[in-house]
Amino acid sequence: MTELDINEIEAYNSNKMGWIELITGCMFAGKTEEFIRRLRVLSYAKKRVLAFKPSIDNRYSVENIISHSGSKLDSYLVHSSDEIKQIIEKENQIQQVDVIGIDEVQFFDEQVVELIEQLANQGIIVIVNGLDKDFRCLPFKNVDKLLVTAEFVTKLRARCHLCGNFANRSQKIVNGQPALWDSPLILVDGKESYEARCRNCFIVPKKEV
């Protein structure tokens, strides 16, 4: 099952049960687009929704979460999971928060996983998205744990930048060439710095000798 239908939303209304939804995959797979869509559906269903994005990701906007295709959603720009917690506590004093969205969860500190669990246990729906693996094809922090704990996991694929086949890997490009193994892990520059690649076209990063 990849997403929730109206019956499950109604069950939430009556039982006040929280859960975790994880949207993951490689670069350019449409994760943010799907993330925004789900939060909008719940907002239309009269749920109070708050969205958060990491301060490191300011490619398109500081105030909005924006997908590569241009879809946007109002959000808080935050530096840590503790800041997320503080904002939620403050907003709950105004009106109870029903849904929390966290964009690019792999860029947050590792305490964010514990916070997400706490929120779900409090009856809040938590929807997060993030890369499942880095450009070396190693598991990304936070997402690796959420793959285990989330009630709902959607793994999206892109199309290979080179051959057009299904892609589930992110190739980091530096100066027109695949990045070396020791290249910095985090580089948020969109399509100019990354390409979606399939298994056949992906080039395993080389280690400097």
Curated annotation (Swiss-Prot):
Catalytic machinery residues: 104
BP GO terms, sorted: DNA biosynthetic process; thymidine metabolic process
Subcellular location(s) of the protein: Cytoplasm
UniProt keyword annotations, A-Z: ATP-binding, Cytoplasm, DNA synthesis, Kinase, Metal-binding, Nucleotide-binding, Transferase, Zinc
UniProt GO cellular component terms: cytosol
Residues that coordinate or bind Zn(2+): 160, 163, 198, 201
Known EC number: 2.7.1.21
Catalytic reaction(s) noted: thymidine + ATP = dTMP + ADP + H(+)
Enzyme class: transferase
UniProt keyword annotation of RNA-binding present: no
Gene3D superfamilies noted in UniProt: 3.30.60.20, P-loop containing nucleotide triphosphate hydrolases
InterPro entries from the UniProt entry: P-loop_NTPase, Thymidine_kinase, Thymidine_kinase_CS
Residues annotated as binding ATP: 25-32, 103-106
PANTHER family: THYMIDINE KINASE, THYMIDINE KINASE, CYTOSOLIC
Similarity comment: Belongs to the thymidine kinase family.
NCBIfam families: PRK04296.1-1
Assembly description: Homotetramer.
UniProt protein name: Thymidine kinase
